[in-house]
Amino acid sequence: MREATVERATAETWVWLRLGLDGPTGGKVDTGLPFLDHMLLQLQRHGRFLLEVEARGDLEVDVHHLVEDVGIALGMALKEALGDGVGLERYAEAFAPMDETLVLCVLDLSGRPHLEFRPEAWPVVGEAGGVNHYHLREFLRGLVNHGRLTLHLRLLSGREAHHVVEASFKALARALHKATRRTGEGVPSTKGVL
């Protein structure tokens, strides 16, 4: 079973995270930030992953450090759980609607970190539970850099912050589920490695 557990501690945060790509799903999520917990549960449910997270951070300063470091820990666990990439689907895309909002996520488990996401171009109003689409960028940046994947996230319609962030997590979850499936033999690259 492809699974990884990571622990990350800094002067600002502490994160313990367990990710399982196959087998049982679910798991307890408690970051001390209820909206982030809600988003991680979307990732767990719609990605059909085992995802357990326990985290604490300097929320009295800002949510930025905690959101970013949970993304970093998730990226580290994803990279470890994927191993050498043998048999991976590798590429995937997913749309996620939520009322007026529509988000597209396209990713490649390439071993090359790149994030294509411009929240300043998103006409989003407000934030949800202390989290906004700029915090989403920091989460994704941590995931991409430490998971070593290429990720494109596009807002096709929507303005309400809660819907935009939640649809983004759902699209990411669905794309990650597809890309992490084992559907072939060998490494899906002409280079022979990811």
From Swiss-Prot:
For this protein, the record's InterPro entries field holds: IGPD_sf (IPR038494), ImidazoleglycerolP_deHydtase (IPR000807), ImidazoleglycerP_deHydtase_CS (IPR020565), Ribosomal_Su5_D2-typ_SF (IPR020568)
Give all cystine bridges in this chain.
Answer: none
Catalytic activity of the protein: D-erythro-1-(imidazol-4-yl)glycerol 3-phosphate = 3-(imidazol-4-yl)-2-oxopropyl phosphate + H2O
Provide the GO MF annotations for this entry. imidazoleglycerol-phosphate dehydratase activity
Tell me the compartments it is located in: Cytoplasm
The EC code for this enzyme is 4.2.1.19
Pathway of this protein?
Amino-acid biosynthesis; L-histidine biosynthesis; L-histidine from 5-phospho-alpha-D-ribose 1-diphosphate: step 6/9
Keyword vocabulary terms for this entry: Amino-acid biosynthesis, Cytoplasm, Histidine biosynthesis, Lyase
Q: Does the keyword Signal apply?
A: no
Q: Which GO terms describe its biological process?
A: L-histidine biosynthetic process
**GO cellular component terms, semicolon-separated:** cytoplasm
Q: What sort of enzyme, by top EC class, is this?
A: lyase
What the entry lists under Pfam families is as follows: IGPD
**HAMAP family, from UniProt?**
HisB (MF_00076)
Q: Which PANTHER family match?
A: IMIDAZOLEGLYCEROL-PHOSPHATE DEHYDRATASE (PTHR23133:SF2), IMIDAZOLEGLYCEROL-PHOSPHATE DEHYDRATASE HIS7 (PTHR23133)
Q: What family name appears in the similarity comment?
A: Belongs to the imidazoleglycerol-phosphate dehydratase family.
Record protein name field: Imidazoleglycerol-phosphate dehydratase
**Native source species:** Thermus thermophilus (strain ATCC 27634 / DSM 579 / HB8)
